Amino acid sequence: MERAYNESSFQFHVLPERASIVTTSSTGTGSGQQAASGVSLSERTAHLCAEAALFMRDHVLSLVSHDLRGPLNAIHSWAYVLERKLDANDPAAQRAIVGIRSGVDQQVKLLETIVDTTRAGTKTLALVREPFALQALFSDSVDEVRTGLARSRGVSVAFESGLSTEQFNGDRERLAAALWLMLTFAVEASANSAKVTLASSADATAWRAVITYEATLAALDDASVPHLLEPFARTQARAPREAGRIAWVLSLCKRVAEAHGGTFEQGEMQDGQASTLALHIPLVAA
C-alpha cells in the first residue's frame, strides 16, 4: 500500500539544486518550472527527496546527541572531582563549579528538548506490511532512476536478477524509497558514460540487493550536471567516514533495513574505484 500525500498542495522546502518541481492539480494537469539542467522533478521524486532529507536530518541529530552526551557526562563527573579538591570556603571556586554544572545541565536539557524531540517523528519507523513480488520491486526501482536522473546524467543502470517469482511480506513503499535512494546516490557519484549495476538475489532466509558503481567523487559536486540530492549531503558524502558509519544522506536506507530486521552497508568510496551499497533483508521478520 503506497502512502498517500497531498498531491495538489505538496510543498518541498528543501529544494535540490538544478531541479524543479512539477506539481499536479486535483484535475490531473501538471505544472512546473523547468530547471537550468533541463530536468523536471515529479511529485513522487520530490517526495522521495524530501524523505531522504528528513531522515538525513534526524541521523545528523542522532549523531549530535550521541557525540555530545559523552563529553558532557565527562565534564559533569570531573566537576565533582574538582569540587572535592577545591576549597569549600573559596566563593570564586564554588561559583565556577556551579557554573560548570549549570552549563552541562543546560546542554543536556537542550539535547532532550530540541534534538530528541525533533527526532521523535521518525524514531519509530512504522511499516505497512503486505506481500509483493520482489522482481517487480527491483525492476520498477531501476526503471524509475534510469528514466530520470541517470538518463540526464548519461549514466546507464543495469539490472542483474537472480529472482523469479519470490514474494516478500514487507513495506514495499519504504523499500522502494531505499532502493531509489541507493540507485540515485550511485548515479550522483558516477561520471558520464559510467554504469551502475543492481544485482538481486534471494535464498531460503533472506533477499539481497547490491549496487555496484565506480566512484567519481568530482561528479558529486559537478555543477554542469543535474543533481537530486542536496549540496550539503553530496559534500558530506565525500568526507572520510569512521568505520561502520555511512554517508548521512543514506540514513533512510539504514533505517528501512533495520525496521525490516535487516542491514544496510556502504562500501568504502575511493575515487576511480568500484564501490558498493548493499541491502540485506531477512524473509522472516525479526
Label the predicted regions.
Residues 83-91:
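Short acidic helix/loop segment immediately C-terminal to the autophosphorylated histidine
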Residues 128-132, 156-166:
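Conserved catalytic submotifs in the C-terminal HATPase_c
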Residues 122-127, 167-170:
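Conserved micro-motifs of the catalytic ATP-binding
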Residues 102-107:
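Short alpha-helical segment of the dimerization/phosphotransfer core of two-component systems
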Residues 220-233:
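Short conserved segment of the HATPase_c
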Residues 261-269:
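Glycine-rich ATP-binding loops of the HATPase_c
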